Amino acid sequence: MSNLFEPISLGKSTIKNRFFLAPLTNTQSYADGRLSDDEYQWLTMRAKGGFAMTMTCAAHVQAVGQGFPGQLGIFSDDHLEGLTRLASGIKAENSLSIVQLHHAGMRTPGELINDRPVCPSDHSETGSRGLSTKEVEQLAEDFITAAQRAEAAGFEGVELHGAHGYILCQFLSPTINQRSDQYGGSLENRSRILMDIIAGIRERCSPDFVLGVRLSPERFDVKLAEILELSQQLMSAGSIDFLDMSLWNVFKEPAEEEFQGRSLASYFTELDRGATKLGFAGSIRTPAEAQQCLDLNVDFVMLGRAAILHHDFPDQMKNDPQFQPIKNPVSADHLRLEGLGEAFINYMSSWKGFVKD
């Protein structure tokens, strides 16, 4: 049985355990993307509570890529002061500091940017316009520049958000991506922007800068077979340090009928990962489930809701393996004690059954 409290290496970094904080929308930043005190408190409390890696929420790399109100920004040097403070605060608690780089693409609410959202191709359902080839190249450049900005702020790595139907995921979709240039058509072409971003970060950031990718294996108009192929390619190339698979439920079967009869997770754990570390996110809410996830033969577990309810989930489990987390719904006062600001509490109130009325 693997031990959740064994150290793990990510590239040239060694971290203290297998608990990673999932990147969680919290709507606590200022309207211009600058860090707020509430977001600083939310993240540094998790670092102090024993998470070996503390990852920010999705931080948008272009102003037009904002996905939700109160989103952390990393598209301007105006964000550096707050990002530097945050990186320092996380590292002070002996937690690896990671920014998730993001662009919402067609999922950008038009009213947030006062413009039409963008997409790999024109998308009538959302009213999004397709990017020109030059704009795709600029998008890749802005992801790379954001990684450099994260490193300049003192962060130890970044994760590329290629999941949940956001823009990198939109490029991977054979349905949404209808381009006829080098960024559309074959899986090789549809994943080209992701590969270009990875190559650019590796070229311009330091050799010990940690780089990961988050992918969705299903939903969002992607195909499991293609995500498996891409995952193997990423791990075989050795160009990323970790792969974060967002499964929604780590114990579920695949949605696609031809793959059913075994767990979705098993398709990824049987891949040859080389030196790349593999982790899962999805409905891991108790110490037993965290251990069961690790026992699927993954290297780390990503906690989301469990980390909202208990900032010190890893430390509590370390001190008491029988620790039982509080059950939902919880009071707003409980969430305040756990370091959530009012904007985050209001956001969580929109999740059915999470916060008491």
Walk through the language-model features, giving the residues of each.
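Flavin-dependent oxidoreductase catalytic cores
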Residues: 1-357
